[in-house]
């Protein structure tokens, strides 16, 4: 039951961080393109790549901490559902080009961010 508490607490923290970053991005860059969702998914992919690498190659993270960070914090921080909804809205109401760009940018950049997170974690671990 303790593990559930920490995962839930992590999820709440991730959700609040997502809301804060998304709001900031919308205020800074405008609402014409879902910059906030893109930012949280890229950052989350990087961090989840790093967390996964650290968990897989060291004993620095207990199983509860690993789940709290990955399932909790990163699960609350990243958002496929918002990406999906915003992409559909772009295509439906505004622009096929913007919607397809959102798909391509999100897939490629998030994948690269995840790999970069793993590489950075490996280098940090190696010292």
Swiss-Prot record:
Protein name: Fluoride-specific ion channel FluC
Membrane topology of the entry: Multi-pass membrane protein
Residues reported in the UniProt entry to bind Na(+): 75, 78
Organism encoding this protein: Sorangium cellulosum (strain So ce56)
Record-linked NCBIfam families: crcB
Reaction catalyzed: fluoride(in) = fluoride(out)
Highest classification ranks of the organism: Bacteria, Pseudomonadati, Myxococcota, Polyangia, Polyangiales
Role this protein plays: Fluoride-specific ion channel. Important for reducing fluoride concentration in the cell, thus reducing its toxicity.
Family: Belongs to the fluoride channel Fluc/FEX (TC 1.A.43) family.
């Amino acid at each position: 039951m303790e593990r559930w508490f920490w995962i839930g607490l992590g999820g709440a923290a991730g959700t609040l961080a997502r809301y804060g970053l998304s709001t900031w991005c919308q205020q800074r860059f405008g609402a014409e393109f879902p910059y906030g969702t893109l930012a949280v998914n890229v950052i989350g992919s990087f961090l989840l790549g790093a967390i996964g690498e650290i968990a897989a190659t060291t004993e620095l993270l207990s199983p509860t901490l690993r789940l709290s960070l990955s399932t909790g914090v990163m699960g609350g921080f990243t958002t496929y559902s918002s990406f999906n909804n915003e992409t559909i809205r772009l295509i439906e109401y505004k622009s096929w080009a913007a919607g397809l760009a959102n798909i391509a940018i999100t897939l490629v950049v998030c994948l690269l961010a995840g790999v970069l997170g793993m590489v950075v974690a490996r280098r940090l671990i190696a010292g």
